[in-house]
């Protein structure tokens, strides 16, 4: 992955956040022989790309959580980052422990509703059980409503309808077109065709107005969702929310107040350095870059940032990162999918074989040097 370099004792990279970007940066730095510490709230990496599959298939969740300690040993610290002191170059943890850094990689990702994300500080075993509990709730429900028709929402609706074809599944979306706005129209049309062919009912260009008054992820008969047009209501047994993803900025916002974009992401230059800070990088969802927030891009950012840390230490030119043509694969259940790569349409069979079968979980286990459970 990279040749090892000789560095001074004062060199220490702190990586804040252990999502796709964080583990990619840590793995790259490890291969370079550059000292680092990875900090995360959880004790295990969550392969949240596969969280929706874990919501419908019993036993799958244990494949989506991978121990940090088993991969990074003493280079991992479990803790909550509550502040960053740029003057003293220290990361401050909730426990009052302070981590000295020569370089900082911020990879805090984004927060969003369960089941797409796990935001609570719980153990790997507890997290797995939360998904197993949701599988049971979905199994109990006769009518499931998915709120939000972005990429997560369409995948969620497809997962439920694929594994439980007898259930009524409704998808409510505030816009007319489904999935990510940057996708080719042909991809978005195919997404709609797949959902309709599976029997998913689509309610488009409507918003749920009482979502904050409804309990999500728990089967409850006669749950009523109010829509914003024509006084329409939808009555169901279970609500799954796939909207409202926000940048996780709480750990760094006070340190970089004038370097934040409107959504809380950090403004970076072409080298992924935070504006005005040559030794601080932002990667993944928390970097302000005009492209969809995806694990695929987060990994690329992280490898560029880690390489630039190395290059800065050995006097080489830094690598630049420029968003290219969009690449995105949508898993529409285990047996279907659609997407595009570098702007080119990818057909359903290809995406099914490339992503939909295991949602790349085996790839993450391999990259972290561990054996995936059967």
From Swiss-Prot:
It is found in: Lipid droplet; Cell membrane; Cytoplasm; Mitochondrion membrane. Binds 6-hydroxy-FAD non-covalently. It comes from the Eukaryota. GO terms for biological process: apoptotic process; vitamin K metabolic process. A lipid is attached at residue 2 (N-myristoyl glycine). 6-hydroxy-FAD binds at residues 17-21, 53, 81, 285. GO terms for cellular component: lipid droplet; mitochondrial membrane; nucleus; plasma membrane. GO terms for molecular function: oxidoreductase activity, acting on NAD(P)H, quinone or similar compound as acceptor. Keywords: Acetylation, Apoptosis, Cell membrane, Cytoplasm, FAD, Flavoprotein, Lipid droplet, Lipoprotein, Membrane, Mitochondrion, Myristate, Nucleus, Oxidoreductase, Transmembrane, Transmembrane helix, Ubl conjugation. It catalyses: ubiquinone-10 + NADH + H(+) = ubiquinol-10 + NAD(+); phylloquinone + NADH + H(+) = phylloquinol + NAD(+); menaquinone-4 + NADH + H(+) = menaquinol-4 + NAD(+); menadione + NADH + H(+) = menadiol + NAD(+). The record marks 173 as: 4-hydroxy-2-nonenal adduction. It is a lipid-anchor. N-myristoylation at Gly-2 mediates the recruitment to lipid droplets and plasma membrane. The modification by 4-hydroxy-2-nonenal (HNE) adduction in mitochondria results in loss of the oxidoreductase activity and activation of a novel function in mitochondrial oxidative stress signaling. The keyword Oxidoreductase applies. Its cofactor is 6-hydroxy-FAD. The modification N6-acetyllysine is found at residue 167. The chain crosses the membrane at residues 13-35. Its EC number is 1.6.5.-. InterPro entries: FAD/NAD-bd_sf, FAD/NAD-binding_dom. Belongs to the FAD-dependent oxidoreductase family. A NAD(P)H-dependent oxidoreductase that acts as a key inhibitor of ferroptosis. At the plasma membrane, catalyzes reduction of coenzyme Q/ubiquinone-10 to ubiquinol-10, a lipophilic radical-trapping antioxidant that prevents lipid oxidative damage and consequently ferroptosis. Acts in parallel to GPX4 to suppress phospholipid peroxidation and ferroptosis. This anti-ferroptotic function is independent of cellular glutathione levels. This is Ferroptosis suppressor protein 1. The gene is aifm2.
């Amino acid at each position: 992955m990279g040749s090892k370099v000789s560095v001074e004792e004062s060199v220490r990279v702190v990586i804040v956040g252990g999502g796709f970007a964080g583990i990619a940066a840590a793995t790259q730095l490890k291969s370079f022989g550059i000292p680092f510490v990875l900090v995360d709230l959880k004790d295990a990496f969550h392969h949240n790309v596969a969280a929706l599959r874990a919501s419908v298939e019993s036993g799958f969740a244990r494949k989506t959580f991978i121990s940090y300690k088993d991969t990074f040993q003493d280079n991992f610290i479990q803790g909550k980052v509550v502040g960053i002191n740029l003057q003293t170059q220290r990361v401050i943890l909730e426990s009052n422990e302070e981590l000295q850094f020569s370089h900082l990689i911020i990879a805090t990702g984004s927060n969003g509703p369960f089941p797409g994300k796990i935001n609570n500080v719980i153990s790997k075993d507890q997290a797995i059980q939360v998904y197993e509990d949701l599988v049971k709730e979905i199994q109990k429900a006769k009518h499931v409503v998915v709120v939000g028709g972005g990429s997560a929402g369409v995948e969620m609706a497809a997962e439920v309808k694929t594994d439980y074809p007898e259930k009524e599944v409704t998808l409510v979306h505030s816009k007319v077109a489904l999935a990510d706005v940057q996708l080719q129209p042909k991809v978005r049309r195919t997404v709609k065709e797949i959902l309709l062919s599976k029997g998913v009912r689509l309610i488009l260009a409507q918003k749920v107005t009482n979502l904050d008054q409804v309990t999500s992820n728990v089967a409850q008969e006669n749950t009523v969702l109010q829509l914003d047009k024509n006084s329409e209501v939808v009555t169901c047994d279970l609500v799954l929310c796939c909207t409202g993803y926000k940048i996780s900025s709480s750990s760094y916002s006070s340190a970089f107040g004038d370097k934040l974009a409107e959504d809380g992401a950090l403004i970076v230059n072409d080298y992924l350095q935070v504006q005005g800070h040559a030794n601080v990088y932002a990667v993944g969802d928390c970097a302000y870059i005009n492209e969809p927030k995806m694990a695929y891009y987060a990994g690329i950012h992280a490898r560029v940032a880690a390489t630039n840390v190395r290059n800065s230490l050995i006097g080489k030119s830094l690598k630049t990162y420029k968003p290219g043509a969009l690449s995105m694969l949508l898993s529409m259940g285990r047996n279907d999918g659609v997407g595009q790569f570098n702007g080119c349409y990818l057909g359903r069979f290809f995406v099914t074989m490339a992503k939909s079968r295991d949602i790349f979980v085996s790839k993450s286990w391999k990259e972290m040097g561990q054996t995936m459970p059967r």
